[in-house]
Amino acid sequence: MRCPFCQDAENKVIDSRESHEGSVIRRRRECLTCKRRFTTYERVEELYPLIVKKDGRREAFDREKIVNGLKKACEKRPVSADQLEETVVAIERQLQGMGEKEVPSSVIGEEIMRRLRQLDEVAYVRFASVYRSFRDIAEFMDELKALREAEAREQRQAPPSAPVDKGG
């Protein structure tokens, strides 16, 4: 590893730590020539399947497409950057866990929608309106109705919450 300051290859590791749930090793290094310190990150090479588009084209997985889609959907919503990153990482892990060489883009789109629905309903509807190419307000309203019906089903299936003791 070359020093980013003097380009010398001689350096020593002064500290190593795991980060990002153990998937990355952060190393603090000191150049033996110029004595300046710098940080490097080591991670396992991630292999993703090819993405098969609706028209049959195949392209390499592009994390930034997911990030950008989520950012647009969540713009001006109470969703933190950490929540977006966790969502992207979860989708990446799911793709890697499939063990497939090719995955239809629809699988990724549906997974994004599933996760957005749990994260923020407005962001979910925004994403769905683009992803599903709503043609008019009726399709938009149908999606909202389906969202409300799913919520009602989930509430009926949820175990009742324990009564709150009001200290009386």
From Swiss-Prot:
CC cofactor note: Binds 1 zinc ion.
Q: Which GO terms describe its molecular function?
A: ATP binding; DNA binding; zinc ion binding
Supply the PROSITE patterns for this chain: ATP_CONE
Q: Which InterPro entries match?
A: ATP-cone_dom (IPR005144), NrdR-like_N (IPR055173), RNR_NrdR-like (IPR003796)
Chain positions of all zinc fingers (unnamed): 3-34
The prosthetic group or cofactor this protein requires is:
Zn(2+)
GO terms (BP aspect) = negative regulation of DNA-templated transcription
Q: Which UniProt keywords apply?
A: ATP-binding, DNA-binding, Metal-binding, Nucleotide-binding, Repressor, Transcription, Transcription regulation, Zinc, Zinc-finger
What are the residue boundaries of the ATP-cone domain, all occurrences included?
A: 49-139
- What job does the chain carry out? Negatively regulates transcription of bacterial ribonucleotide reductase nrd genes and operons by binding to NrdR-boxes.
Q: Which NCBIfam families match?
A: transcriptional regulator NrdR
Task: Give the family, as the similarity comment puts it.
Answer: Belongs to the NrdR family.
- Protein name per the record: Transcriptional repressor NrdR
- Name of the gene: nrdR
